[in-house]
């Protein structure tokens, strides 16, 4: 980890860092041992009754049954957003109360709902990378393709495709590797992002601004001014760079600490990538380019700086 210490004074025009370590919030470190076993116990004992109850609740939040034909043009997006936000609010509340078994159950409900799947497909087909294809060269550029994508976005039997490796220039003249997932994998990651973000935002450091929804560079600049403009402010700022942060992180550590479906996360981490028509396995690191990577790294940095 390289560090530079600079005396506070005139601005040198550097971009604001994505991580401003001024003061850590009272965050919660998620541990498997902290998760209640109530949900798994009920699932084992009540089996069919629990599954029926989950399905009834899922249908309430879904807005449409996942097995029926979907017409992209007639989807009520206001209802979809409302359903997703309602479940996310429940995840936030359960996180604040430390009810990790309930968090897990609500995440499952959201990632298997029609509203969650529809919103995930919409987000990956309307963002700036909507026309950027993965290794399968497939894009969802028509309403019919988008509707079909919702119906085929299923966890059972899901196997992620390898990433398409591309390189973009960095400010220092070097190249930054990016892994471009196929649209089907991007949509699946966007779906699980809906269930992970409420936890990441609830437990995240209040002074972290990079890769955060509803936060911008202007917000980071304002916080820097608020912290450094007083006579009693710290006379020094510390800038650090974690070398190859994305490339060298342990898969086992991520699977143990990121509060999401472990099986799905494992599949993404081990998907590999194709570079110049050659397949490469991934034994460590998380690719830059997928929707799930930023919140996963924010959770990693939160725990790192807390310790």
Describe the role of every protein-language-model region:
Residues 152, 156, 203-207, 212, ...:
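Conserved polymerase palm-domain catalytic core
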Residues 1-147:
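Non-catalytic, polymerase-adjacent accessory regions of viral genome-replication enzymes
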Residues 101-108, 118-126, 133-139, 161-167, ...:
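Short coil/turn segments at secondary-structure boundaries
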Residues 79-82, 86, 101, 105, ...:
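Generic recognition of stable, solvent-exposed alpha-helical segments in well-folded globular domains
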Residues 75-77, 111-115, 212-226:
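Short, motif-level signal for alpha-helix interfacial/capping segments enriched in acidic residues
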Residues 141-160:
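Amphipathic alpha-helical blocks
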Residues 169-172, 177-196, 202:
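Hydrophobic alpha-helical hairpins/lids featuring a short glycine-rich hinge
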């Amino acid at each position: 980890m390289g560090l530079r210490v600079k005396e506070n004074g005139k601005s040198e025009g550097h971009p604001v860092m994505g991580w401003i370590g001024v003061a850590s919030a009272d965050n919660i470190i998620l541990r498997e041992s902290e998760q209640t076993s109530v949900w798994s116990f009920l699932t084992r004992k009540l089996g069919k009754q629990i599954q029926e109850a989950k399905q009834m609740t899922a249908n309430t939040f879904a807005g449409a049954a996942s097995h029926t034909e979907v017409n992209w043009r007639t989807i009520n997006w206001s209802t979809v957003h409302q359903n997703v936000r309602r479940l996310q609010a429940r995840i936030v509340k359960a996180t604040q109360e430390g009810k990790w078994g309930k968090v897990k159950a609500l995440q499952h409900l959201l990632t298997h709902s029609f509203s969650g799947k529809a919103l995930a497909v919409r987000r990956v087909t309307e963002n700036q990378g909507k026309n950027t294809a993965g290794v399968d060269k497939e894009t969802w550029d028509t309403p019919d393709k988008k509707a079909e994508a919702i119906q085929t976005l299923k966890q059972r039997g899901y196997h992620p495709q390898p990433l398409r490796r591309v390189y973009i220039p960095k400010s220092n003249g070097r190249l930054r590797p990016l892994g471009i997932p196929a649209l089907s994998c991007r949509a699946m990651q966007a779906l699980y992002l809906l269930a992970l973000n409420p936890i990441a935002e609830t437990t995240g450091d209040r002074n972290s601004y990079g890769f955060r929804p509803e936060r911008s560079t202007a917000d980071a600049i304002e916080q820097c001014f608020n912290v450094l403009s007083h006579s009693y402010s710290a006379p020094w700022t510390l800038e650090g760079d974690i070398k190859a942060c994305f490339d060298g992180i342990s898969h086992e550590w991520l699977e143990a600490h990121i509060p999401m479906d472990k099986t799905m996360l494992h599949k993404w981490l081990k998907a590999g990538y194709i570079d110049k028509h050659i397949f490469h396995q991934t034994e460590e690191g998380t690719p830059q380019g997928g929707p799930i990577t930023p919140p996963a790294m924010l959770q990693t940095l939160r725990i790192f700086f807390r310790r």
